[in-house]
Amino acid sequence: MLQISHLYADYGGKPALEDINLTLESGELLVVLGPSGCGKTTLLNLIAGFVPYQHGSIQLAGKGIQGPGAERGVVFQNEGLLPWRNVQDNVAFGLQLAGVEKMQRLEIAHQMVKKVGLEGAEKRYIWQLSGGQRQRVGIARALAANPQLLLLDEPFGALDAFTRDQMQTLLLKLWQETGKQVLLITHDIEEAVFMATELVLLSPGPGRVLERLPLNFARRFVAGESSRSIKSDPQFIAMREYVLSRVFEQREAFS
C-alpha cells in the first residue's frame, strides 16, 4: 500500500504541493488529474524518490521513501529509452544495473516484450519504432524489475488518438494481469475517467486534493466490456462532463 500523509513540497523555491493525503491500495489504479502547474509531475517525482519533500511522509508497504528504489517502476512521457540499445536490451537495462545474470535478465526481457505485444521486435532499435511502440518498451522496462508500484507520468500525451486508445486498453489489461498498484498522471479528462478506480482532482498550484472520485469504468473494461461501449455510456459521459466542469471551475477561480 502507498500511503501519503500531510505532504508539502516546494519546486524552485515556490510551494508546489500542500497537505496531500492519499492512499493507494494493492490492485488499485489511482489517476491524478489537474491543470498545468498543479504539481502532478512533482507528486510523481516525490513518490519515485527523484526529489526530496519538505514535510509529511510517503510510505510504500510501511517503509518510508527517501530515494529511488526497484520497488517503484517509472514510465515517462518521453520514454527515457537508450537509442543505442535494441528493444530487448532496453527492457533488460534495469536488471543489468541490479546485477541480474545475463541469461536470466534476457529471459525476463523476452517475457515482458511479449506481454506488451512487441514479440518479434526484440532486436529493433528505438529509432525504428513508432511512438506507441516506444511507450510499450518503456512499460515493459518498468515491469521487468517486478515493482510493487508502477508510476506513469502522462505516458500517452504525445500519441495520436487511435494509438492512445490502444495504449490505455493495454495498460488496463497489464494492470489486471499483474495486480500492480498503478499511479497515473494525466491531463486528459476522458483518459482519467476511463482508467481510474479512484480519480484525484488537484487544484492549481500549490496543488491540493480538491476531490476524490471512486469510479468503476476500468473494472468494467477488464471484466469484458468494450471501451467503445463504456465511453458511450450515459454514466461515463455524465462523469466526464462533471470532471470537466470541476477543472474549468478551478481554472476560472485562479485565472
Curated annotation (Swiss-Prot):
The complex is composed of two ATP-binding proteins (TauB), two transmembrane proteins (TauC) and a solute-binding protein (TauA). PANTHER family: TAURINE IMPORT ATP-BINDING PROTEIN TAUB, TAURINE IMPORT ATP-BINDING PROTEIN-RELATED. Signal peptide: none annotated. ATP binds at G34, P35, S36, G37, C38, G39, K40, T41. It is a peripheral membrane protein. Part of the ABC transporter complex TauABC involved in taurine import. Responsible for energy coupling to the transport system. Its main location: membrane. It is an enzyme of class 7 (translocase). It is found in: Cell inner membrane. Its EC number is 7.6.2.7. The gene is tauB. One of its GO terms (cellular component) is plasma membrane. This is Taurine import ATP-binding protein TauB.
